[in-house]
Amino acid sequence: MLIVLLALLLLSCSPKYKIVKEYVLPQNTLCVQDCKEKFLECKKACFESYNACLKESVERARKVYLSLLKDYERKSREYEKAYENYLKELRTYRETLYRIKEDLKFYERICSAYKDKEACDKKEWLKKRIRFYERRKPLPPQKPTMPSYEILLKREREACSCECGCEKLYDACFESCRGKVRIKKVCVENCD
């Protein structure tokens, strides 16, 4: 426990770093200006595409929801029928088990009172029958789950991305202009 606490203490005190890019301009800055314009165009197109995806996500989620709702209604009807059958099977199961247990009580009394071999054998057989039967208790059917529009909409919106690779394109363009992109690791917290 002490080792875990010490490890946590050391980790919480250890420095935290951030990766930053440093751009070293080339002599021809007109080329870099063209890269900046392409970068801004890429970001604008990406933003528009992202917003369009978000708007379309509402319609996509609605279509999926309606389809799942129809499926849910069908499964609910099937569930109701299966549940009625389950209740019938459970009633029969309980009645049969009750009858077997009553027979067991009867044969236990006879076996105990008269030491009748046939009654004692029947008693043991009924005990085994009860254990066997108890393991075969009917199980209720699984109730269908109602679809959630909010969850579907969230899933559809998560599929939309505002990451279009514009920064990578800018870096490649910048380097093609003979500029240099340096990646640095900079301490941002708990620096000594």
Curated annotation (Swiss-Prot):
This is Uncharacterized protein aq_678. Gene3D superfamilies: 6.10.250.2200. Keywords: Coiled coil. Residues 53-111 form a coiled coil. The keyword Coiled coil applies.
